[in-house]
Amino acid sequence: PTRTLGFGNNITLRNSDLVSDGTFVYMSNNKNEFYALDLKTGIIKWKQKVNSEIRSVIISDYIVTVSNEGLMLVLDRNNGSIIRINNILREIKRKKRDDYYPVGFIISGGKVYLTTKNGRLFVINFSDATFNKVLKLDRDKLQRPVYFNKEIYITKDNSIIKIN
């Protein structure tokens, strides 16, 4: 899901996938920038300081994203104001947090399902960002979860993991 652009040997820009509400397109990158762009004109509606490379989720008037540091942010879709920030990696020891780099997430049934680069699936209550559970599914990077037919699927290398 991440797009990488290299400019010589000095700058590497990684963007998230684009998400849209039909009027604006939203994207973030690893340079601490989160944008709302007018879909027709390309003009920036607002810009926020959020360091994220993963696809955001639009829910009603809000945009939910997870930063590279494991902060779950809820932003106002209309003006970019940060409404809420929760550290979803707070239960992980500081020196181990780099191992839990967020890869992708979905929100379903009031829960956030977040995959990491070290094969973990975090199940977090969306309302208060408390841990429900952490599942060790693999030792390597998992892809972004997919919700289909009341079940969650996660791809890894050449396999699909089904979560009930």
Where are these regions (language model features)?
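Extracytoplasmic beta-rich repeat domains
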Residues: 1-22, 43-60, 84-107, 131-149
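Beta-propeller domains
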Residues: 20, 27-33
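Conserved beta-propeller blade signature
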Residues: 24-27, 63-65, 73, 111-114, ...
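Surface-exposed loop/turn positions within WD40 beta-propeller blades
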Residues: 31, 69, 118, 157-158
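Short loop/turn segments that connect beta-strands within beta-propeller blades
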Residues: 38-42, 77-80, 125-129, 164
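Redox- and metal-dependent alpha/beta enzyme cores, enriched for Fe-S-associated oxidoreductases
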Residues: 52, 68-77
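C-terminal hydrophobic structural anchor segments
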Residues: 102-123
